């Protein structure tokens, strides 16, 4: 499993609520559960499926996925279709809209050493859309939050994308989307 940033987007709900927790968690050994490993496989498949839907070369990772099954394929196909639908909506106003998959973002202007990898970023002349794929089925994840006004993980990704691309695209709208197919979200 890859090393996470000290103040990672995926743990932002925790370190925003309890800043000392970041230091405590950093001292713990990072071990991945079978659920996390399954999620990693699902993300690998999704990235491949979106790349293929975009007409890009992408080696099929299925043989190397430990947790691959028909449900993972079905969920990944749905995700790829969803991303393409969102892209088509943006292309109605901007034919040059782009999709970035597994894009590194840097939000360190706001959070020390703040970096992460966004599952999917859609860019158009005035709209930024962040799509986060959640394969888990234990916890329903929302794109909004009464406490923070938005999902903290997606907000970190959005800040990083704005920092990198706003000079080119001049965003007026930022959309944050959770795609969680096994919980119909």
Where are the regions that the model predicts?
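Metal-dependent nuclease catalytic cores that hydrolyze phosphodiester bonds in DNA/RNA
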Residues: 1-127, 175
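Mg2+/Mn2+-dependent nuclease catalytic core
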Residues: 37, 95-185
């Amino acid at each position: 499993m890859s090393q996470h940033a000290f103040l990672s987007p995926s743990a932002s709900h925790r370190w925003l609520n309890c800043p000392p927790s970041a230091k405590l968690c950093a001292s713990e050994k990072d071990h991945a559960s079978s659920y996390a490993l399954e999620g990693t496989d699902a993300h690998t498949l999704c990235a491949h499926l979106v790349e293929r839907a975009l007409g890009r070369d992408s080696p099929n990772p299925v043989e190397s996925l430990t947790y691959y099954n028909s449900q993972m394929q079905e969920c990944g196909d749905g995700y790829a279709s969803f991303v393409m639908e969102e892209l088509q909506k943006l292309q109605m106003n901007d034919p040059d809209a782009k999709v970035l998959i597994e894009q590194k973002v840097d939000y360190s202007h706001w959070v020390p050493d703040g970096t992460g990898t966004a599952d999917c970023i859609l860019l158009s002349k005035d709209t930024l859309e962040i799509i986060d794929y959640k394969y888990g089925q234990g916890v329903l994840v929302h794109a909004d939050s009464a406490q923070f006004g938005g999902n903290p993980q997606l907000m970190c990704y959005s800040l990083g994308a704005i920092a990198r691309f706003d000079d080119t695209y001049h965003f007026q709208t930022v959309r944050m989307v959770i795609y969680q197919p096994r919980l119909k979200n």
